[in-house]
Amino acid sequence: MQIDQTALAQAWRTLNADVTEIDLVAIGSPHASLTELQQIASLMGGRSCHARIDFVATVGRDVMAAAASDGTGEQLAQAGIRVIPDVCWCSITEPLFPPAARVLMTNSGKYAHYADGLCGRKVRFGSLRDCVEAAVTGAAKSHPPQWAQEVAPGNEATNG
């Protein structure tokens, strides 16, 4: 099997619904680490989530305690981000899963693949930075990241 730029572009399209407005950012499949929570807090930079957006990160109990100890948990709460321990997105159902959410965004390829079948919602997939920006603006980028852009015929890199 050869994975080329066309395959990467197709995979990105498969993991991204044809809608950019989101309702939920879902981080933590598998559980988010303390480093990821700290990165989210840093990327938020004092901003808050868009009024329409639910932002939920799932973590292990030890990460929840560490985030509470170092102040990250408070920074996330002030930004409108909920941190929930001891659950995984692949097992969350309503009412813990926000019933009004119709489109979610995640940085997890695993959850981007399974979410439609598990929760019946449309999905957007992106980096942690993309997820944070979508939480603030209410919309995901409409174009793929550079790694998922198709190369025009004749411009392919060669292995030499």
What is the role of each PLM region?
Residues Q38-A41, G73, A77, R129-E133:
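Predominant activation on well-ordered alpha-helical scaffold segments within soluble catalytic domains
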